[in-house]
């Protein structure tokens, strides 16, 4: 028995493919900049060698992952869900980059907390409220988990009230970014 499948509009699929390719190219630039900064921090002795090693390994793995996603996006496929999954892969790259950066840079006190906005912004390419808010909550969960892990390993770096205040503040910022992106995306639909 043959099942009749509804054909997806080619324009949406083509748009998703182009968006995925652009997103991967932008992430090449982001990851190259990240690698250069790791090199600069290493040459200036601004970070401990073990942190430089963790960031270098992360850079290498994410660069390979982004290259694989970029290569996969070049393939023309009839289903738009294929490109959606590739974009989810880019979102995952952003989450890993932000999580490792925050953990290796003093947890909640890190300046790299802003990197958690990247997966939310990348998810906005999907033009889907669930993807945007789901990614915001994933970013929030990863941030809280990595910050608390760092805090419990280094308890003398911050006060309890200070860490909880920063966690609530940054979590609210992640949700505000998601809400603002949804307003922009919904207006363009």
Question: Where in the sequence are the language-model features?
Answer:
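N-terminal juxtamembrane segment and adjoining first transmembrane helix
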Residues: 1-84, 183, 189
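Alpha-helical transmembrane segments and their interfaces in multipass membrane proteins
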Residues: 36-61, 79-85, 107, 126-186
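Subset of alpha-helical transmembrane segments and adjacent helix-loop junctions
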Residues: 79-118, 132-138
